[in-house]
Amino acid sequence: MQPLEMAQEFVAYSKTKGKGVSRTLLAAGAVLALVIFALSGQGPGGSSASARTFQPGPPIAALAPPGECAFREEWVAAPLVDRRKVSDDAVLLRFGLADGRSLGLSTCACLLAQGAGVVRPYTPVSTNALSGAFELLVKVYPEGALSKHMATIPIGSSVNFKHIPKNVKVQYPFPATRIGMIAGGSGVTPFVQALHAILGSPGDKTEVTLIASHRTRADALAVEAFDAWAASNSRFRAITTLTREPDPSAWTGRRGRLDARTLKAFLPPPVPDVLILVCGPPALYEMLCGPRDEPELTGVLRDLGYSKDQVIKF
């Protein structure tokens, strides 16, 4: 999210869903975002180095209970109102909503998108504080018909969306005091929503560790945002590891694939009140916990002592 959009979310949130939260704090956040916007020298549609990063702004817990989503179980067309390239193969897409309403999507829920003859699930990275629109961070794959379709259609064209309430596997507030999140590639997107809820909710004391695996630094779209959230919140720790980063490189963080040793070093231990959330490509599920659509727990997480009830496969 760009600074101006960050301010717009703060203002919209203070007007619609800011009950119980200091209006002064919200206003200050909006002013800060506008100051950053002014200092950046970037106007709407402008370009700068920050235009190629994903900037979700500070955590905002704009929660919505199940059943309030703007999309139901029938397909509804939403117009593409903005598209911004954030890496060589990823775009941030903004779709419009009628009557200036918010998306109203419950935490960690997803939307189904339809286009180019295929249907795929996507978890929005914007919060319910954004009025009149929602945003998707889409990885564009060479073989991905829908992702290529959304990355190339003209502004003003529409994509069909719907929401099936039963796709929410776990809901905020989460039934744990310590949470480990393991993400592969674009699997970080549902965790953006979860972290907004946890870190943005006053009084929430849940401790969270996020371990994200990407191929290269260019693929780690949210690393700067996660690092900023971790720096400002002692309850959150973010670890990023790259598997194919060229050498030499400016990257000074961890390298290599996820393995039992890394997970044991950073995840909360397999004790009561601990929950492990997993999201990523099929190979990640196979290694860590078994296929996504199979309830039984296998793989590295079982070997580390976690139970089936402690591991949620997104």
Residue locations for each model-derived region?
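Reductase modules of NAD(P)H-dependent flavoproteins
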Residues: 2-40, 211-314
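Ferredoxin-reductase
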Residues: 58-157, 214-215, 243-244
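Residue-level recognition of conserved beta-strand edge/terminus positions
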Residues: 114, 162-163
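A short, basic/flexible loop-to-alpha-helix module at the beginning of a structural domain
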Residues: 164-175
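Conserved S-adenosyl-L-methionine
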Residues: 176, 199-208
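Structural motif
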Residues: 178-180, 209, 275
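Histidine-anchored nucleotide/phosphate-binding helix
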Residues: 188-202
